[in-house]
C-alpha cells in the first residue's frame, strides 16, 4: 500500500511542487497520474521511489515512512519498487539479457536464479527470442519492454512508470500498455504518469489529476481531462 499524508514539496528555488497531497493507493491498483506540465506529476512519482524527499508530510510504502528512513535503508526499499523511465535507461554495451540480469546481480542473487528469472520476465514481455541482442538492435517499443522486464525482475510490489510511452508512436505505445496491464493483472500495483489522453480514456483505470501541486480529481474509472 502507498499512502501520502499531507505531503508538501518546495524546492530551493522557491517552486512549490506539491501542496498538501493526501492519497492512498491500494495493492493491485492501476493508477494514472495526469495533469498539465509543471503540475507536480513527476515530483509525485519520484516521491514513491524516494528520488525526492518531501519537505513535510508522510509517504508510507507498506507502512514504512520514506520521509524519515535512513539513507542506507533506501536501496532495500527500492528493491520492492520497479521503475520504468521515458528514455529507457538501458546500458548500451550490455545485451537484453544482461540489462535485465544486472538488477539481480547488484543485490547478489545466485546465477541460477538470475538466469531463470530473467528468462521468465523476457518471456512475459515477449522478448525472450532477443535476449542476446543489444539495445541499438531493438525498436523503441522493444527497448521500453526490456526496461519493463528489468523493473519487474525482482518481483516488486509496485511498478512506477514515468511517461513510459512519451517517446513512442501510437501502435508501439499500446504494446507497452498491454505489457503493463498484464503485469497489473498478475497483482503488481502500477502507478503511471502520462500525457497520453487516448490511453487514459480508453483503458478506464483510476485517475488522479494534479494541478498546481494539489489533487483536483480522483476517480475510480476516470478520464484524462482537458490540459493545454
Curated annotation (Swiss-Prot):
One of its GO biological process terms is:
regulation of phosphorelay signal transduction system
- Gene Ontology CC annotations of this record: plasma membrane
| Membrane-protein topology | Peripheral membrane protein
Query: Where in or outside the cell?
Result: Cell membrane
Identify the CDD domains for this entry: ABC_FtsE
| Binding residues annotated for ATP, in chain numbering | 35-42
Give GO MF terms, alphabetically.
ATP binding; ATP hydrolysis activity; transmembrane transporter activity
Listed A to Z, the keywords are: ATP-binding, Cell cycle, Cell division, Cell membrane, Membrane, Nucleotide-binding, Transport
What does the record say about the knockout? Cells lacking this gene and ftsX, the next gene in the operon, delay sporulation onset, as a result of which they form a medial rather than polar septum at the onset of sporulation. This is presumably due to slower phosphorylation and activation of the spo0A transcriptional regulator. However, at later time points these cells undergo polar division and eventually form smaller than wild-type mature spores.
**Primary site of residence:** membrane
Domain ABC transporter as annotated: residue spans:
2-227
UniProt xrefs under InterPro entries: AAA+_ATPase, ABC_transporter-like_ATP-bd, ABC_transporter-like_CS, ABC_transpr_LolD-like, Cell_div_FtsE, P-loop_NTPase
Name the family the entry cites: Belongs to the ABC transporter superfamily.
**Quaternary structure and interacting proteins, as annotated:** Interacts with FtsX.
Per the entry, what this protein does is: Part of the ABC transporter FtsEX involved in sporulation. May act as an importer, possibly at the top of a hierarchical cascade leading to the correct temporal initiation of sporulation. Acts upstream of the histidine kinases KinA, KinB and KinC, the RapA phosphatase and the Spo0A sporulation protein.
Q: What is this protein called?
A: Cell division ATP-binding protein FtsE
Provide the organism lineage as a comma list.
Answer: Bacteria, Bacillati, Bacillota, Bacilli, Bacillales
Amino acid at each position: 500500500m502507498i499512502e501520502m499524508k499531507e505531503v508538501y514539496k518546495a524546492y530551493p528555488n522557491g517552486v512549490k511542487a506539491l501542496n498538501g497531497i493526501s492519497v492512498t493507493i491500494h495493492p493491485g491498483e492501476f493508477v494514472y497520474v495526469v495533469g498539465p506540465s509543471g503540475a507536480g506529476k513527476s515530483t509525485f512519482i519520484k516521491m514513491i521511489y524516494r528520488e525526492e524527499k518531501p519537505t513535510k508530510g508522510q509517504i508510507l510504502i507498506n507502512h514504512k515512512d520514506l520521509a524519515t528512513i535512513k539513507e542506507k535503508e533506501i536501496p532495500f526499499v527500492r528493491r520492492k519498487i520497479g521503475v520504468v523511465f521515458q528514455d529507457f535507461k538501458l546500458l548500451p554495451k550490455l545485451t537484453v539479457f544482461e540489462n535485465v540480469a544486472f538488477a539481480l546481480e547488484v543485490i547478489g542473487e545466485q546465477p541460477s536464479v538470475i538466469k531463470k528469472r530473467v528468462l521468465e520476465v523476457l518471456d512475459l514481455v515477449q522478448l525472450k527470442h532477443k535476449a542476446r541482442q543489444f539495445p541499438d538492435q531493438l525498436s523503441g517499443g522493444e527497448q521500453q519492454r526490456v526496461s519493463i522486464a528489468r523493473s519487474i525482475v525482482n518481483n516488486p510490489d509496485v511498478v512506477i512508470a514515468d511517461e513510459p510511452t512519451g517517446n513512442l508512436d501510437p501502435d508501439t505505445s499500446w504494446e507497452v500498455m498491454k505489457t503493463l496491464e498484464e503485469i497489473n493483472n498478475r497483482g503488481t500495483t502500477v502507478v503511471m504518469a502520462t500525457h497520453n489522453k487516448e490511453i487514459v480514456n480508453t483503458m478506464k483505470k483510476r485517475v488522479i489529476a494534479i494541478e498546481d501541486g494539489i489533487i483536483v480529481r480522483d476517480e475510480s474509472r476516470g478520464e484524462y481531462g482537458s490540459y493545454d
